Each structure stands twice: as structure tokens, then as C-alpha cells.
Amino acid sequence: MVGASRTILSLSLSSSLFTFSKIPHVFPFLRLHKPRFHHAFRPLYSAAATTSSPTTETNVTDPDQLKHTILLERLRLRHLKESAKPPQQRPSSVVGVEEESSIRKKSKKLVENFQELGLSEEVMGALQELNIEVPTEIQCIGIPAVMERKSVVLGSHTGSGKTLAYLLPIVQLMREDEANLGKKTKPRRPRTVVLCPTRELSEQVYRVAKSISHHARFRSILVSGGSRIRPQEDSLNNAIDMVVGTPGRILQHIEEGNMVYGDIAYLVLDEADTMFDRGFGPEIRKFLAPLNQRALKTNDQGFQTVLVTATMTMAVQKLVDEEFQGIEHLRTSTLHKKIANARHDFIKLSGGEDKLEALLQVLEPSLAKGSKVMVFCNTLNSSRAVDHYLSENQISTVNYHGEVPAEQRVENLKKFKDEEGDCPTLVCTDLAARGLDLDVDHVVMFDFPKNSIDYLHRTGRTARMGAKGKVTSLVSRKDQMLAARIEEAMRNNESLESLTTDNVRRDAARTHITQEKGRSVKQIREVSKQRNSRDKPSSSSPPARSTGGKTPVRKSSSSSFSKPRKASSPPEKSSKPKRKILKTVGSRSIAARGKTGSDRRPGKKLSVVGFRGKSSSARAS
């Protein structure tokens, strides 16, 4: 009885297997791979994973359902493969701040509008008036951190929306302080102070603050150098919430009693790297001293600090960490890297071309299209020469450098910004490389910068807030090494933080020394081989004769150094030619080495973008 039941069970199982084996032949698209299962795995699509075979068999007649099932199965298998990959281990040094910044970068992908960042309706109304809907990367990272009342450093490339990244949350925090703590607007007692290195940047930040003040309901004033003090004093005597200005002028108003520290709760240093690079450190310390003393009191709630920067070198970062202990660094993925929406062209000048004529040929196509162009020079003399040459060729220009008075610089910027004006070209120095929000289509570097940081600031004048731009650099012979290194770093999407002319030359010199050492070792080995080969007797010499009537033995390669051979020739005569040969060959190798060392040029060849599709060298010929 038991044997019969086993036979019936085996027949039923074999028939079922035979039936299922025929299904893939009838429906080829049902041929699925054998699923793989891993421990501790939770399927992405549980409904597809738990579907039984009878259900699939009953829905065979519905092709859409079968395609849907196959799609789910493929997704499940893809998820299995991804889960099987080992997780990438991060280095142990990357902890703390970088982990939190990476978390914020990941959450940035999920943020599609400003409402998800927790902004109030008042602030959202200001954004709607500005027609800004999607936050940038620095805004997704910075707004939540500032709203958590943390002291942070916001690092992102120029034109990425850093001003709104700190203004929006600070305005909302001031409104919350009014509701929770009963703080009100008072004369001469601002609650927020924004320090900027230049008057132009102060005016730019002030315009952004005024644009959102109508909906957010706060009052801001501008206090910067180059303007009369009396109107600023009258503005400070009114009820104020925010003061935007330069450090020197704000300290002057504090010393004269026009402004007090008592209610300052939020401090912003815009373009902090520029402030520390240009010697604003003593003024910043002088401004911070009363705030730090006030924060030591038991009843005081302290103040929140926000530093904003487009570049952050190691020296400036060390200084920031010393002055603002415990501050948190938040950086975007584009910091110290090229702007993705800008095209970078490097024109190599061999020395025979006229550099001013080359500049004119670069400008003509852009000016014919009606584009706005900025021409950067390293010195005042170079800027004057460019301005004079372009004026002689009927190209209207305006200047922006240190010798132009502040009021005249403002007028020149207005002429350059005017869409209907006749001054589409701005000839400037690095004074215009930072803090100016201009709609520039083309940036031309008549003089190549001395370091990569200045290159980044110059290129940041174009391709701002997602717009497209173009950057053209005229590279002379002395700047080719740095230009080649910058071009290589941008091609590999590397950071340009520590690239300077001195560093690149130092690295090239080290590489050259290493190559010369290797070449010297190789030449010494060749000399030793030649010496050994000359010391050996030629193959035509007669073989050594044996004594005592023994059978002669064929001479091997080592028999030339046998004792009978050495005895037949005096040692004095054999040693002198050796020294002479060694000395002659050595002097020849030293001369050859000196010749190759002088002819060799270190550095990588540039990819030349010539004028109008032709290389500059071909044009010169």
C-alpha cells in the first residue's frame, strides 16, 4: 500500500514538472533566470516576489499582465544584484562635519521646492515674487542648517545663490524671535549685521534684502564706505532690523554711538575668504570682541555666525577655525571646480603674435552677437593698454580698477549693465573678480592669473544661476605650465584649490630632477656594460694552450679572466687603458646628459583653441 502511494505521488510530481517545463516553449518570454536569494534581504517589490506559480499560470492568457510580471521580476533581480555589492568603506578621517554635509547633499536630491525646507508663508511669498521655485544645492544645504541656529561656513561657487541661502532663514528666525521672545525693532539696535568686503557687494546684498523685505516684513539699511555719513546716521536713528555694510564704516558708526551691539543675534561675513585675504582680519576681530564678551554672560543667548565663501584655501580655513571655534563647514560638490555651464578655451601664444591683435580677434565675434564681455588684466598698466587699444579700434569700453574712484566705478557698472547702452566691454583687474552680480556672456583673460583661485573667481562672473557662458584665456609662454595644469584638472573634474604658478613650477622641477636621476642611472649602467665588453678579448683570439700534453679545452666566456691570461699581460699596462676608456666615456655621457637636459622642456602640451577655428601658430606663419 505504501509503495503504491509513493508511485502515484511520483507520477503526479513528474507530470506537474513536465507541464511547467513546456510553458517556456509555448511562451518564450516567460523564460526567467533562476532567482538568487541572500540572507537578510527584503524584496523591493514584495507583491512580485510572493506571487505563486498558479497565479502566473492562470494569467498566462493576459499578455499585459505577463509583461508587467516580467518587469517586476527584472527589477527584483536588479535589486538583488545591487544588494549583493559590498558597501564602499569610507576613510576613517572623513567623519563629523563631512558626514553631516554628505547627509545634507543626499537630502538635497529629495527637495524640489522651498516648502520642503520648512520656510514660512511670508518667505515663500517673497520667493514667488522673485519667480524662484527650485532651490540650488547650497540653498538645500544651508537653509536647514541656519534655521537650526548653527554657526556654519557655506562654501559654493560664485553665482550659486548663497545670498538667499542665509537671508531667507535669518529673516524667518527674526520673525520667530518676535513671536517667542517678544523682540521688537528698535532704533540703532539691529538684530542682524552683514559684513561685506566691498561697497559693490554691500549694495548687491542690500538689493536682495530689499526685494524680500516687503513680504517678510523687516527693515534693512545700507552702511558702506564711499558715501556720506550723515544720511546713514539718520537711517540708523530709525527702527531697523538688519544692517548691511563694510567693516570700516560700521565700526565708525559704533565708535560715534550711532549703533550699538546690544541686540545683535545674527552675524554674516559674506565673501569671508576675500576679507581675510585682503587684510580685514583686525577689523573683524575688533567687531567680534564685544560680541564675544557679551556671550560670556550667563543671561545672554549669544549670537549665530554665518560665513559665506566661494573659495576656501587651507590657510583661510585654518584662520577661520581659530577665530570661530566649533564652526561647521558645509560645502557643495562644485566648490573649487569648474563651472559646468561655461566653456573654457585656452589660446596658446608662442610669442611671435601680437597679443592685443589676438584679443581683438577674440572679441569681435562676441561683440557682433551683442554679448557682454569682461576683459581681465593683472596690472593697471596692462588695463590701460587694453583700454587704449580697444578705443582706437572703435570698441566702447568702461574701466574698473583701483585707480578709478568709487563713485565712478558705480557709474561704469551702470553703463555696462545697461542693455541699451553702448558699452558692452568692461576692462578690469581682479577687483571686479569677486562679489559682483553681473550678466556676462563672455570672460576674456588678457593676462592669465597667477593662481587657480583667481581663475575661479574670474570665471564666476559668467554662467551664473544656471546660465551659459564662455571663458577664453590668452596664454603666454610663461603661463603655459599653470594653464596646462588647470586645463588637466578641469578635464578630470578635479579640485583647483592649491594650484599656483610656484607650486606647478616646483612640481615640474621635481619631476624633471627625478627623470634626470633615472636617465643618469641608465647611462651609468650602459657605460659599465661598454667597459666590460671592451675588457673581454675578441672571439678571433687563439684559445689557451694546455700544458703537459693534455687535451685542449674550448674556452668559455669566463676563461678570459683565468690566471694564465692575467699572467701573460702586465697589470700596469692593462689598468691604464681602462682608466682612459672610463674617463672618455664618462665625459661623453656627461656632455650628452647636459645637452639633453637643456633641450628638454618640462610641462604638458596645451590643446590649442585657435582664432576662428585655426591655431595661433598657423596664423602666425
UniProtKB/Swiss-Prot annotation:
Which EC number(s) are documented for this chain? 3.6.4.13
Q: Where is the composition biased (Basic and acidic residues)?
A: 503-537
Q: From the UniProt record, list the reaction(s) this protein catalyses.
A: ATP + H2O = ADP + phosphate + H(+)
Supply the InterPro entries for this chain: DEAD/DEAH_box_helicase_dom, Helicase_ATP-bd, Helicase_C-like, P-loop_NTPase, RNA_helicase_DEAD_Q_motif
Which residue ranges does the record assign to the Helicase ATP-binding domain?
143-330
PANTHER family with a match to the protein in the record: DEAD-BOX ATP-DEPENDENT RNA HELICASE 50
Gene3D superfamilies the record matches: P-loop containing nucleotide triphosphate hydrolases (3.40.50.300)
A Gene Ontology molecular function term for this protein is: mRNA binding
Question: What is the official name of this protein in its record?
Answer: DEAD-box ATP-dependent RNA helicase 39
Domain comment (free text): The Q motif is unique to and characteristic of the DEAD box family of RNA helicases and controls ATP binding and hydrolysis.
* Record's compositionally biased regions (Low complexity): 555-572
> Which residues does the annotation say bind ATP?
156-163
Belongs to which family? Belongs to the DEAD box helicase family.
- The lineage's top-level taxon is Eukaryota
User: Which biological process annotations from GO are given for this protein?
Assistant: chloroplast rRNA processing; ribulose bisphosphate carboxylase complex assembly
